[in-house]
Amino acid sequence: MTAPTRTTAPTGVAVEVTDLGVTLGGARILTGVSLSVRTGEWVTVIGPNGAGKSTLLRAVGGLLPGSTGSVSLFGTPIARLRRRDRARTVATVPQSPVVPAGMAVLDYVLLGRTPYVPPLGRESAADLAAAYDVLDRLDLTGFAARPLATLSGGERQRVFLARALAQGAPLLLLDEPTSALDIGHQQEVLELVDQLRADHGLTVLATMHDLSVAGEYADRMVLVAAGAVVADGPPREVLTDELLGTHYRARVRVIEGEHGPLVVPVRARRPAS
């Protein structure tokens, strides 16, 4: 099958965030956040609920124009990218996408091809081939004509990813991409994204709550707490008993896995009765 048309990613730094600050509804969400992501790298942002992870991804995707500091994608400040150019550069899978009522799966996935459709034009045969390719890769071909509203949560999650992959952008932002998936489809989705990294140099910036899964796929992890970066490095340096205990207020034991550290919750000991 024909793979989705992909914009060629320059080498070097894909994402450069400098001194980013975000205030929403009068509340300071992010303060002085700086990070960089190399082209072809997989960086996963972790942190407790309310830390600002999703807000960071929205800012990187250009969805928070009122933020302070700067965000550049492949060397270009995001504020200078026209909407169509931005859509060809970065694809986003948000936690709760807005889905038009009654829209079928194939039509939704084809929305990812919008940046390549000329004004007043229609999707080409190549666009349809790209959409069917990702549907096939995500085991969704049989759902192409189904309304999205009739699918389970996990099936919809895969459709949301399919739309983003059909976009063919060199940068993929994933906000909790496996939250509604069973373990089999989690592995299927993440292995597909990782294969696209290997084959096409795709750059991935994700947020994830499952720390063990995050540690197996990420090249680097960024721990955010109270709106600030408190740790940045390889999974083995960030997923430690001390850091997780401090910022998650959780009892855990970190053990070595085949592809990265695994985080195991530890129950509190109760005094003998």
What residue spans do the PLM features occupy?
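The feature captures the beta-strand-to-loop junction immediately N-terminal to the Walker
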Residues: I46-P48
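Helix-to-loop junction immediately C-terminal to a conserved catalytic motif
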Residues: G61
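Conserved ABC transporter NBD signature motif
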Residues: G69-P77, R86
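Conserved ABC ATPase "signature" region
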Residues: A125-F143
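Conserved ABC ATPase signature
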Residues: P147-L151, E155
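Catalytic Walker B motif of ABC-type/P-loop ATPase nucleotide-binding domains
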Residues: L172-E176
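ABC ATPase nucleotide-binding domains
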Residues: G245-S273
